């Protein structure tokens, strides 16, 4: 079995992008941390032939929803909001409008697009995560992409 540090190094960026797509950039780091804490506990029992990336995306999906629910119950102080976000090595910094457009999609479409195009999961695994059929996952992804294309065309003409 590979050292867990190697798993984090290889799959960490994908997990962060999935967390970001599910709950947004503000809470994504917390969900990422929770994902790898949970994964670390379960990693010794993971079968050798398991798809590690799919396993991590499943955990990330669940932890992101947990973090989002927990944070939605907490008050947010507005006085401490910085004027400008911190610049980090994040692929979203080059395309903030893409992440905003993705966040505007209905939940199942957003998740299907993120899991397929960001995490690279097949529709059968996406269907398990979303609790629907592979055809429904494929349709949600296609509808989400159609909406994203429409939003970008509108932004280009604005």
Please place each PLM-identified region on the residue numbering.
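Short, charged helix-capping/linker segments at alpha-helix termini
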Residues: 1-6, 16-34, 43-50, 134
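Acidic, proline/glycine-rich intrinsically disordered inter-domain spacer in sigma factors
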Residues: 2, 74-103
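C-terminal flanking helix
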Residues: 16, 36, 106, 110, ...
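Structural recognition of an alpha-helix C-terminal capping motif at a helix-to-coil junction
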Residues: 30-37, 50-62, 139
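Arg/Lys-rich amphipathic alpha helix in sigma70-family domain 2
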Residues: 45-48, 58-79, 91
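DNA-recognition helix of helix-turn-helix
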Residues: 61, 65, 130-158
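Helix-turn-helix DNA-binding module
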Residues: 103, 107, 119-139
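A short pre-motif secondary-structure segment
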Residues: 112-116
């Amino acid at each position: 079995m590979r050292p867990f540090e190697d798993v984090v190094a290889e799959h960490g960026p994908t997990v962060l992008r999935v967390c970001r797509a599910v709950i947004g950039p503000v809470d994504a780091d917390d969900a990422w941390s929770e994902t790898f804490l949970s994964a670390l506990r379960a990693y010794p029992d993971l079968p050798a032939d398991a798809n590690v990336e799919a396993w991590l995306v499943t955990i990330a999906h669940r932890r992101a929803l947990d973090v989002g629910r927990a944070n939605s119950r907490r008050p947010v102080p507005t006085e401490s909001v910085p004027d400008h976000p911190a610049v980090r090595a994040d692929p979203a910094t080059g395309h903030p409008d893409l992440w905003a457009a993705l966040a505007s999609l209905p939940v199942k479409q957003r998740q299907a697009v993120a899991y397929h195009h960001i995490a690279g999961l097949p529709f059968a695994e996406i269907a398990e995560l979303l609790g629907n059929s592979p055809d429904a996952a494929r349709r949600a992804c296609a509808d989400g992409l159609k909406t994203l294309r429409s939003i970008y065309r509108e932004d280009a003409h604005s």
